[in-house]
Structure formats: C-alpha cells, structure tokens
Amino acid sequence: MLFSALLLEVIWILAADGGQHWTYEGPHGQDHWPASYPECGNNAQSPIDIQTDSVTFDPDLPALQPHGYDQPGTEPLDLHNNGHTVQLSLPSTLYLGGLPRKYVAAQLHLHWGQKGSPGGSEHQINSEATFAELHIVHYDSDSYDSLSEAAERPQGLAVLGILIEVGETKNIAYEHILSHLHEVRHKDQKTSVPPFNLRELLPKQLGQYFRYNGSLTTPPCYQSVLWTVFYRRSQISMEQLEKLQGTLFSTEEEPSKLLVQNYRALQPLNQRMVFASFIQAGSSYTTGEMLSLGVGILVGCLCLLLAVYFIARKIRKKRLENRKSVVFTSAQATTEA
C-alpha cells in the first residue's frame, strides 16, 4: 500500500514538473510558465472568477456522492511537502458518484495566501476570494489506469474545489491535516497521518456547486479537469489559518523560504460556459432559459383555461339536462291530472 502510494506520487510529480523548476513568483513564476509549459498559455485554463449572474442553470446536475470518504480504511495516509503545497495521498477506495464516469481519489492539497494579506483561494465567486482553497483530485478509472495517464486526457481528472473561510471555532476535520504540518516543514519531508472521516472536509450542502471544464492550476497546466467548485464554504479557525500560513517552507535547506501565496492568478473564461446545479435567489436567466420559462408559463395557462372551459361546459350541460327533466316531469303530471 505504502509502496504503491509512493510510486503514484513520484509519477504525478514527474508529470507535473516535467523536469523543470517552477515557482509562483520570480524568474520561474507563473508569468513565465507558458514558456516552459505551453499549455499554461492555452484558452481553457484554471482558476476562474465565477460570476453567478452569468452561469447557466443545469437541472440535470445531481448532488455529488462521495463514496468511501467516511471510511478511508485503516492504512495511514502519506502527507508530503512537495515545495509547492502540502499534499495528502488518498486511497483508491474513495470515489465520486454523480459524474459521467467513475472517478477515484488520488490526493488532496491546499492553496493559501499569507498573513496580513487578503485572498489565498484560487477560484473566486463574484470576484470574492477566500483565505484558502482545498482541492481533492480524482481520475477517471473507467478509462485510464493511472493518474498520470488521465491527467493528459480531456476530462481525465475531476477535481473538487472547496473555498475555505475563517470561522469562530476550530475545524476538527482539517485539524487532522494541520496538526501534522510541523512534521513536514521543509520541502520533500513526509509523514504519516492516521485515517479520518474525509467527508467532513466538504461543505454540508453538496447539491450546490458550479461545474466547468478547465485545467490543472500548476504546470504543466493540462486542460483535462472537470471542475466542481462548491458554492458553500468550509470554515477553519484563525489559529488554524495562521498555522497553514506560517509553518511550511518551500525549500530544503537554509535560508528557508516560507511557503505562502501558492495560488495561481485568475484565468480568462474565454468562450467556456459555467453551469450551476441550483438557482440562486435573485439570479438572472439566460435568453434561452427565459424563453423556455415563458413558453412553459404560456402552455400552463392555456391548459388551465382549457380545463376551466371543459369543466364549465360540462356543468352547463348538466344544468340544461336537469331543466329538461323538470319540464318533462311537470308536463307529464299535468296530463295525468
């Protein structure tokens, strides 16, 4: 189990780095990524700013079903500081339902900002960033044998994006990760984390999310990701956020460089569509949706009018029959008299 997890991680790192060195700032920063990783300059990149008045409601999007998240097994999970983020390897017994194919879990990782500065999440909703963001990475196991193979294919990956804000109380689920950060302070350090209920890392409301086609947010920026960004947020305490912002280093040796602001700048949406699994109060509709809604209302009113017409006609006919019956009975009584 441990060997296979380490092998998977090595393959993923090689695929992600491509033998090149990259950072978020400086001469190897994200402005220079396209020079070494051409796909980073393509037109379906992530993250994006999700504008809720421009999304398209899709009633066919079901609530996600995270299978096995509450029972991740008994084997310890590997936590690794790879110099870009802190990453937790996940067992393949975890998978997502509610997607076109079966996507099994591979790893999760975090993105965050730095103390005293706003922002830290990669995705934004209505131009509003949060302090951090959790990504849970899955790959299409129906079509591909490994994460590295799926990462290069359209919709080979399915990533859950959870925006994280600061709340008043400590989040016990996130503490299972954050309490071990001091064991992986420097790049390439690893430790083991006891298995825990991963479902509690997710928002309670899994039926409200946004869906779009995008990319990895780090080199090589493959445009292979079916993104699910939850509308509801998770919360951690300020103490937990500061631990995330101030514990890890992106370097192996002195002088140590604090691992902060490991989030990519927003990318243009271009011609892509963003779908929503729900209708927000006060949200606007597209022209097609408004036309469909208008036709639906018109047809509904017509059906109602027809129903009222036939009911009224039936009542009128019955009344006429009753009147004829009364007249006939009265005439018969007069004749007999």
From Swiss-Prot:
The keyword Ubl conjugation does not apply. Residues 1-15 form the signal peptide. It catalyses: hydrogencarbonate + H(+) = CO2 + H2O. CDD domains: alpha_CA_XII_XIV (cd03126). Substrate binds at T217, T218. One of its GO terms (cellular component) is membrane. Residues 20-278 form the Alpha-carbonic anhydrase domain. Residues 16-290 are extracellular. It is an enzyme of class 4 (lyase). Activated by histamine, L-adrenaline, L- and D-histidine, and L- and D-phenylalanine. Inhibited by coumarins, saccharin, sulfonamide derivatives such as acetazolamide (AZA) and Foscarnet (phosphonoformate trisodium salt). Gene3D superfamilies: Alpha carbonic anhydrase. Keywords: Disulfide bond, Glycoprotein, Lyase, Membrane, Metal-binding, Phosphoprotein, Signal, Transmembrane, Transmembrane helix, Zinc. Its main location: membrane. It is a single-pass type I membrane protein. Zn(2+) binds at H109, H111, H135. Residues 312-337 are cytoplasmic. The keyword Coiled coil does not apply. Reversible hydration of carbon dioxide. Belongs to the alpha-carbonic anhydrase family. This is Carbonic anhydrase 14. The gene is CA14.
